[in-house]
Amino acid sequence: MATASALVPAAPATRVSTTDVFRNGRFEANDWPILGDADAFPSEGQVIVSFARALDLLSGDVLGNRRIGVIVGPADKVAELAPHVDRLAVVAIDFPKYADGRGFSQAVRLARLGFAGEVRAIGNVLIDQIDFMRRVGITAFEVSHAVTRRYLEAGKDPAPGLYYQPS
């Protein structure tokens, strides 16, 4: 469960999906919508659930062989997913605020666990962060920011061709 401290306050979690996802240089239909905690878990279909709900589902026998997606918030303990990483298809890393860079660290931790599915950025996804998100393994982006959407729709990929000083 996500926890806050005096130094790192909790940010509101992203709990609503966009209708499309930017991946492979274009917007595609969002095939993994976010399911709210109060919503009934569907008997079929692909859904992304909260971190706590995912741990509950993965610990029980409700899923069978079914794979799910999980939202990882800035304060969630990614290591808790280690025993279940092969049962996850999508991990949506929440970026609740521009100034909160913990999602980048979460993506690195996820890669160290050996997760091989789609890593998706959700929340406050802005054009100047996308290249840095790609560098830590994020491959898909739910973009609700109007300016970022316009840039991406126009084919203005933020990835520079030359790095003078890598981050």
Residue ranges, per PLM feature:
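Hydrophobic faces of well-ordered beta-strands that scaffold small-molecule active sites
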Residues: 45-49, 66-72, 89-93, 117-121, ...
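Glycine/Thr-rich beta-alpha phosphate-binding loop at enzyme active sites
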Residues: 65-109
